[in-house]
């Protein structure tokens, strides 16, 4: 595994952004989360991605959260910055602002809502890559964006030097094989789907950017450490215990359930989210609590 591949591999946390009851970012809590994941053995953190509520933070807030996450990490764990937008110019602005932030790379989502063609998607990511030397990880999540970046488009983008990988969040593990075939073995493929993450590793993915990791960090780190050395019996044992949790953390829109679960476990002080997201419905809370118990977290 190359140095770059090892930097973006294993158990990567799609980190929540803790907030107080007024909707302000709770930086003291964020610092504790960073320490928690370092101690648990997580391999990297994604700051202000989908799970970090990037859509409801201003550009200035996004940058500050990322910079503080890097500061708290003190070089002990790679930080990947969420830097996507559905306007190419805005994504470029965000990426440029991160130039000297100390991040290991940027995660940039397929433009959402405006539904570009495959050529539009290609030109979008090409323009972002050309504005920076930072490694770029593409992010395909059609269930949220309304656009699906095809493996053939990924392969074209893989020819650009600083586009180094993709977070593939369709949940279709056959995509892992297809992208590896078309983009080459050195192109990093990260699963973005907890329920199929272990299967993705078996098919050649280098790691998983995980929501479950927020609340089961040590289990997830252990599971993917076992998986990446081929000890799938031990990995499957952990995964079976977490499978209910993988599913129930999406029982309402992410990051609603995971923030409530993190609050329930005492990892954050509040389950507050910014509107239009609201805290986990009371009638759903017992179901997520049961999943936490099955996982051995309560």
From Swiss-Prot:
It catalyses: L-aspartate 4-semialdehyde + pyruvate = (2S,4S)-4-hydroxy-2,3,4,5-tetrahydrodipicolinate + H2O + H(+). This is 4-hydroxy-tetrahydrodipicolinate synthase. Its main location: cytoplasm. Pfam families: DHDPS. Belongs to the DapA family. GO terms for molecular function: 4-hydroxy-tetrahydrodipicolinate synthase activity. It is found in: Cytoplasm.
């Amino acid at each position: 595994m190359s140095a770059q591949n090892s930097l973006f591999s294993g158990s990567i946390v799609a980190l929540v952004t803790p907030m107080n009851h007024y909707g302000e970012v709770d930086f003291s809590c964020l610092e504790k989360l960073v320490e928690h994941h370092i101690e648990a053995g997580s391999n990297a953190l994604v700051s202000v991605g989908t799970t970090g509520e990037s859509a409801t933070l201003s550009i200035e807030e996004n940058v500050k959260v990322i910079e503080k996450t890097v500061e708290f990490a003190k070089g002990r764990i790679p930080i990947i910055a969420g830097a996507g937008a559905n306007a190419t110019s805005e994504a470029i602005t965000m990426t440029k602002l991160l130039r000297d932030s100390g991040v290991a790379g940027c995660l940039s989502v397929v433009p959402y809502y405006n539904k570009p063609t495959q050529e539009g998607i290609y030109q979008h990511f090409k323009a972002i890559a050309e504005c920076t030397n930072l490694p770029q990880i593409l992010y395909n999540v059609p269930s949220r964006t309304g656009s699906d970046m095809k493996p053939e488009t990924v392969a074209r983008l893989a020819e650009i030097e600083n586009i180094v990988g993709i977070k593939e969040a369709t949940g279709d593990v056959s995509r892992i094989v297809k992208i590896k075939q078309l983009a080459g073995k050195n192109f990093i493929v990260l699963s973005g789907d907890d329920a199929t993450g272990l299967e993705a590793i078996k098919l050649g993915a280098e790691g998983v950017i995980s929501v479950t990791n927020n609340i089961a960090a040590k289990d997830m780190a252990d599971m993917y450490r076992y998986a990446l050395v081929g000890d799938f019996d031990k990995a499957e044992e952990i995964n079976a215990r977490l499978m209910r949790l993988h599913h129930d953390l999406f029982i309402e829109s992410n990051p609603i359930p995971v923030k409530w679960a993190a609050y329930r476990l005492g990892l954050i002080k509040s389950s507050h989210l910014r509107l239009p997201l609201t805290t986990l419905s009371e009638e759903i809370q017992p179901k997520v609590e049961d999943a936490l118990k099955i996982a051995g977290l309560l």
